[in-house]
Amino acid sequence: MAARAPAARTLLCPAFRRTHSHDPADRQSPVPFRRLWPPCPRPRRGLPAATTSRSPSSRPTPQLHIALPTRRAGRHAPDLAALFEAVGVRHVPGVVTTIHADAARWTSPHRRRPVHPALRPLRPGRRSRLFTPPIPGLAEHAFNVDAGGVTTSTGERIRPPPSSGRGAAANPVGAADSPASMTVRARSADPFLAGDRHATASSSTGDVALAARRPRQRCRHVPASTL
């Protein structure tokens, strides 16, 4: 009968073998645990303290904007003009140049002279980012509804004080979760600013917001397939 081959021993860490193995030879291993890891940080001992210290970076935190490939460069971006026309919104062409927080008005060059239509609600879309160039008053109204609660805080900032004679309901701020809910919210908007949710994905230039005024007429429903 052939001799039986010895069982293969599992290669374990000397410290593990010394503390967990049932083999007496392993428990009598002269290699202590404290000698295993000191060689790792040894090259750092000769470096000055200023070299090994860590300090937070002064660079701003990078932001990642993700867009679908079909909507890249604005090729298949939704037509906001057509969307709001279906709910009875008349657009005011032009670029917003100044937002007056106290008077709830905004300035835009239109027909060779600036117009100052009254600004009431601010209507950002869900997961939208508003490009914030150096426009006076825009920093107070910049919004980012990727995180919850930002819309509510924006409403608190632009809501007029009670002494102004206007009720708190005159300046509602809401984020539209879908095109259908956007049409419902837009029924009471007169006028409002709507940020293009694909503006930062396609280009960082152009209009920072879409200024619109709603005439007094009945709104129609817009299906979700519009976007």
UniProtKB/Swiss-Prot annotation:
<comment type="similarity">
    <text>Belongs to the NifX/NifY family.</text>
</comment>
<feature type="compositionally biased region" description="Low complexity">
    <location>
        <begin position="48"/>
        <end position="62"/>
    </location>
</feature>
<feature type="region of interest" description="Disordered">
    <location>
        <begin position="107"/>
        <end position="128"/>
    </location>
</feature>
<keyword id="KW-0535">Nitrogen fixation</keyword>
<feature type="region of interest" description="Disordered">
    <location>
        <begin position="19"/>
        <end position="63"/>
    </location>
</feature>
<protein>
    <recommendedName>
        <fullName>Protein NifY</fullName>
    </recommendedName>
</protein>
<feature type="region of interest" description="Disordered">
    <location>
        <begin position="150"/>
        <end position="227"/>
    </location>
</feature>
<dbReference type="GO" id="GO:0009399">
    <property type="term" value="P:nitrogen fixation"/>
</dbReference>
